[in-house]
């Protein structure tokens, strides 16, 4: 039903300029950069097909079973494919998303981040840390991310390296890529396609539904800076360079033979028509037996690759035109050890050409691009929160359809009033879908009407035979604030973002939605391959099984449970005298988050009592619990003791050094934490490091019996990356370490 065309585009360097096509009433074609009024526009005289009644899918629905029967409404959302303009603030917490706690050694503070978005974790944008101690290190965040639900949502993770690709819950190849400012990727479910696309329909086989298309190489978008271009190249893994060729006209195009179409999807039942325009909307392809020299059908021979060429292809893309990544200040111990030292380009060729990605298309066909025939109904613009719920997304899609319908009706009335005769026919377009971008081409001239990078697509819904495509507006950095507005009555701090909504009509509406979802999955797999990661090594189920078999390292629990270590102390002091202590946080990841005694003033009440030791954890003071309170609050409580003469403390006697035991069965399992200058600065929740007792903000003192206090950062990273089996470490709070080593002057309270 749909054809494939080979799209000759460079890696993320497509021309975003709009080339006008013969659309009704000479309207200006649009791109993702142009401004639209909130009411949008449609070609005059366009008639909207009847909208099938649709109710939004319930929130708890995790998977749509796409079958030919019943309601075909489905929707895709890519909440994480944010452009840089929308990176202000972290997304709201959603279930199933991995959280991290970031420790900043410069100011002893903690930052909580979701998937480390905005924290610059990928090897393409980490901000230098303002400290002389920072050592250069190569970023290696290749976490095995938590699974993503398949309710056509792409939650978590954009971008390609400015963002993160969505990760399917049931997809065996799962990993988290960090610092994805735009996070755009979707991974489709493995279910729901076999019944909808059988190998044979009524016993008859037909030609491939897709065909490839050739096009001229487009120029680089002038408004994107080089970082965005590099990011798009790295993440999208755009198609290999193809010799540019002019579009063949319908009369002079090469006659396609039975072998000219690449077999993209299992053939599906389709009615054949001798002319494209007699039965719109129709897929572009006709079965071979229906083709004859008189047909005005456009046909293009796809460029094929031999099995020997395909493994080399991602390598060529990665190496073509890329700048060297910026130097990093952190090392994230989450990938196979060979990621540290072996150049990624040496590993790509050994991986399978393509990993099976659930969906109606073959992965290689989505790399090259596929074409769907559709009718363009119109576009409008909506204001939306950054990460609305799925139900709100569906309501927005229905609102866009309603607006377009109203505008069509108004245009029809205007035509009738002006006695201009019948309304013009619908604008026929080719919807080009690839793992890099989505383009809308005029069906007759093949000129670009709209062009959106895949990472900017936030949502797609099919409602009956209507397809709604939502994309984030792409603005220059200097104008990034222009796309953020606040609507009257909106909650304070709730920013509104401009979304451009395109509405199409097609018999293949559901297939289009599924194909775009699969394109996100393919883009994610190609991102892994470009970064030297074998997707087949990243089975989330296998990693989850390992986690489930490991028990929490309970050294702390045993220590806290021992009543001999829990003490209630009474300290005497003079009125107006400070307690004379320095306290620091125990560190996120500790079994009881409280404050630790890091230093005592000589001759002060705490030191005079002889009952306290450095490393003791303070549970309460004068009956006020300190567990779970911020450090500043705890310090304020201690300062409030100045005018008292007696202080009652509940403490747990602890050594200043914490013992950690990480069980890593194989090098392919990520450790799940990152290190900066020997300090643990982030930790993956639920990973083997957290289970082993790793704490954010702690300084690594010893690894497997070897002191690393004076060891260079790179050697610490190498030692951890190469460790397998049981990894024993000793750590202490970084602030305590600096006090004990004289790097900081204590401020007693």
Curated annotation (Swiss-Prot):
Residue numbers bearing the Phosphoserine modification: 11, 208
Annotated Acidic residues bias: 81-94, 131-142, 218-227
GO biological process, one term: protein transport
Positions of the PDZ domain: 568-653, 659-735
A GO molecular-function descriptor: amyloid-beta binding
InterPro entries to which the protein is assigned, alphabetical: APP-Binding, PDZ, PDZ_sf, PH-like_dom_sf, PTB/PI_dom
Compositionally skewed regions (Basic and acidic residues) per UniProt: 305-315
Entry keyword set: Phosphoprotein, Protein transport, Repeat, Transport
Region span, Disordered: 1-94, 130-343
Ranges of Polar residues composition bias in the record: 70-80, 237-247
Nucleotidyltransferase as UniProt keyword: no
Functional description taken from the UniProt entry: Putative function in synaptic vesicle exocytosis by binding to STXBP1, an essential component of the synaptic vesicle exocytotic machinery. May modulate processing of the amyloid-beta precursor protein (APP) and hence formation of APP-beta.
Protein name per the record: Amyloid-beta A4 precursor protein-binding family A member 2
Organism (species): Pongo abelii
Gene: APBA2
